[in-house]
Amino acid sequence: MSNKGQLLQDPFLNTLRREHVPVSIYLVNGIKLQGQIESFDQYVVLLKNTVTQMVYKHAISTVVPARPVTIQQQDGEGGN
């Protein structure tokens, strides 16, 4: 994965994780998963609801927070 992708994904997912924001995750096959992001790395997201599911990022189409969030960008990161 490109560094640019990580610069966008990591702050977004980390904010959702830290603030315990409920999310809906839509997979490329149309399935909707709901829960809170427990953890993530370069390849997977751990989504916690009644159980914890490991969801591969390549299977994710869209991540929709249940409420608006403000993403904290580190110095030097642009929004291009």
Curated annotation (Swiss-Prot):
<dbReference type="Pfam" id="PF17209">
    <property type="entry name" value="Hfq"/>
</dbReference>
<dbReference type="GO" id="GO:0006355">
    <property type="term" value="P:regulation of DNA-templated transcription"/>
</dbReference>
<dbReference type="GO" id="GO:0043487">
    <property type="term" value="P:regulation of RNA stability"/>
</dbReference>
<dbReference type="GO" id="GO:0003723">
    <property type="term" value="F:RNA binding"/>
</dbReference>
<comment type="function">
    <text>RNA chaperone that binds small regulatory RNA (sRNAs) and mRNAs to facilitate mRNA translational regulation in response to envelope stress, environmental stress and changes in metabolite concentrations. Also binds with high specificity to tRNAs.</text>
</comment>
<dbReference type="InterPro" id="IPR010920">
    <property type="entry name" value="LSM_dom_sf"/>
</dbReference>
<comment type="similarity">
    <text>Belongs to the Hfq family.</text>
</comment>
<keyword id="KW-0694">RNA-binding</keyword>
<comment type="subunit">
    <text>Homohexamer.</text>
</comment>
<feature type="domain" description="Sm">
    <location>
        <begin position="10"/>
        <end position="69"/>
    </location>
</feature>
<dbReference type="InterPro" id="IPR047575">
    <property type="entry name" value="Sm"/>
</dbReference>
<dbReference type="GO" id="GO:0045974">
    <property type="term" value="P:regulation of translation, ncRNA-mediated"/>
</dbReference>
<dbReference type="InterPro" id="IPR005001">
    <property type="entry name" value="Hfq"/>
</dbReference>
<dbReference type="GO" id="GO:0005829">
    <property type="term" value="C:cytosol"/>
</dbReference>
<keyword id="KW-0346">Stress response</keyword>
<protein>
    <recommendedName>
        <fullName>RNA-binding protein Hfq</fullName>
    </recommendedName>
</protein>
